[in-house]
UniProtKB/Swiss-Prot annotation:
Organism encoding this protein: Mus musculus (Mouse)
Full protein name: Prostaglandin D2 receptor
Record membrane topology: Multi-pass membrane protein
Topology Extracellular: residue spans: 1-20, 80-106, 171-194, 283-306
Compartment(s): Cell membrane
Amino acid sequence: MNESYRCQTSTWVERGSSATMGAVLFGAGLLGNLLALVLLARSGLGSCRPGPLHPPPSVFYVLVCGLTVTDLLGKCLISPMVLAAYAQNQSLKELLPASGNQLCETFAFLMSFFGLASTLQLLAMAVECWLSLGHPFFYQRHVTLRRGVLVAPVVAAFCLAFCALPFAGFGKFVQYCPGTWCFIQMIHKERSFSVIGFSVLYSSLMALLVLATVVCNLGAMYNLYDMHRRQRHYPHRCSRDRAQSGSDYRHGSLHPLEELDHFVLLALMTVLFTMCSLPLIYRAYYGAFKLENKAEGDSEDLQALRFLSVISIVDPWIFIIFRTSVFRMLFHKVFTRPLIYRNWSSHSQQSNVESTL
């Protein structure tokens, strides 16, 4: 057998490995996503009944719900297999020996599926935010609730077809050290195009999605900054323009403090998302194009995969918990109240000077 990985055929968990990190990631992801769903349900954002007490959910929150459910399903389907392997001290291939390599292939398929699906949904949220802030006319005409609901099933169908390519012969799933996880094979001794090509294609697609998400978030951040700057210099004109443009569909009636909320939210999201995605992309390219065909970096691959899994943990805390009224009230008291007082003082001094003139 043409083995490129040290634990490719292992039947036990490598010595020195601990389930602590996997358990912590699973617990944090499960708690965060469940709390996010509870907050969504309590806020009534899941109700589609029109009316003053039950307003229809916005496209943004429909996308948040889809992302939260996707992350929760990924944690519940993938992490128990890792913890079971540690508990039994058996690799994924040995947990169900009668199934052969099917459990390992299923695990790798789920890993690639949920990693790609979450990234696509994050891009959809970034595009929605950028359009709503920078192109309100186009947003109000073309971005509808019905189309927002279709994002999750369309993403799932695409990821299902793309990540199933190794089952059709293009690409290969393999077991990585310490024997508790499987993923796309990124190194091959004979440099088979069907094996290396799929890993490069997957990482290239992830890189393009990350780049597009960062660009959209930077565009949204610039629009927020521009809105805040225009409102400071021309407050009456900005309010009149927003009312005429109809851009208050979602963000048009933003208070300056809410604009600051969105700015900080997008900045934090962009930094964390980029930091968590780049390690796996780098490892895929490194494994495909390095001169030596040995997989001596199994520990680095595992760390890169853990970084990628952190995205599904951070998502609910960033998109939902950060936006709750309690957290925002605390944020305003700590960070924005001095800013408000400073702006009010400067405005009062300017008014006094103008009155004396």
